[in-house]
């Protein structure tokens, strides 16, 4: 028997799926607010670092969830790999005139891995793979230019601020994205040597530099780093 509090918590969250927070445009592609009030939507654009946390839709309606990945990587991503973390409505190419969100963009790579596993279709993975690689390369070049396996440069995130210096929170996204990408690439028989080396460095940094024995921490750094907008805007 499931405890009544658990039932209430699950039901209360799943009702969002039938609210105006979530809808589909004319061609079936999903587009979401972050939430909604009685007369308005709150924070537009299927925000990547907010929808990182949603796990119901990919398991209940995986085809619909995949349209979010296809929008993020095929439509809202620039040729240089910069990904807008809010997509336009109607869904269409967007101006890349704001920071990329480190947690949103890296989280999207892990979500591709998840969605591929749920779908079980290698053709879909092959279709999106080069876009995912382009996205990850942008993240590496922008936030880990020294190839240390750590998100070190100032980076925008879900708190609508820039983190200055490595943190357990954002670096876990980086580690996870590297691990997901290595797994996908190896499945497709790609040479993943460079990315696996970065993954090993990232795991080592997480365990030995960002864990104090009790908590994962942030190593605040305000010197010897680039100004955040210079790399995040194109």
Residue ranges of model-derived segments:
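Aromatic-rich carbohydrate-recognition surfaces in CAZymes
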Residues: 29, 40-150, 165-185, 196
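Single conserved hydrophobic/aromatic residue that forms the stacking wall/gate
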Residues: 223-234
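N-terminal leader/propeptide and maturation segments of large enzyme subunits in energy/redox metabolism
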Residues: 1-10, 180-195
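Short beta-alpha connecting loops at secondary-structure transitions
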Residues: 156-164
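Short amphipathic alpha-helical coiled-coil/interface segments
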Residues: 196-206
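C-terminal ends of transmembrane alpha-helices
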Residues: 144-152, 208-214
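An acidic-aromatic substrate-binding cleft motif
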Residues: 1-55, 59
């Amino acid at each position: 028997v499931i405890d009544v509090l658990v039932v209430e918590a699950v039901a209360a969250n799943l009702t969002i799926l039938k609210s105006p927070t979530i809808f589909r445009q004319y061609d079936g592609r999903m587009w979401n607010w972050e939430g909604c009030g009685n007369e308005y939507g709150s924070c537009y654009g299927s925000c990547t670092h907010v929808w990182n946390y949603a796990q119901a839709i990919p398991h209940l309606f995986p085809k619909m969830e995949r349209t979010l990945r296809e929008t993020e990587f095929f439509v809202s991503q620039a040729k240089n790999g910069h990904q807008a973390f809010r997509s336009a409505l109607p869904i269409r190419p967007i101006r890349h005139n704001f920071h990329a969100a480190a947690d949103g963009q890296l989280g999207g790579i892990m979500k591709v891995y998840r969605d591929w596993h749920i779908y079980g279709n290698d053709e879909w993975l092959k279709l999106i793979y080069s876009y995912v690689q382009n996205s990850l390369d942008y993240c590496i070049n922008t936030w880990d230019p020294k190839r240390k396996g750590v998100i070190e440069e100032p980076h925008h995130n879900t708190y609508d601020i820039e983190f200055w210096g490595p943190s357990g929170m954002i670096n876990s996204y980086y580690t996870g994205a590297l691990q997901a990408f290595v797994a996908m690439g190896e499945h497709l028989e790609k040479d993943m040597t460079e990315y696996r080396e970065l993954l090993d460095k990232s795991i080592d940094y997480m365990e030995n530099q960002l864990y104090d024995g009790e908590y994962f921490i942030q190593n605040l750094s305000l010197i010897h780093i680039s100004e955040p907008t210079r790399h995040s805007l194109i």
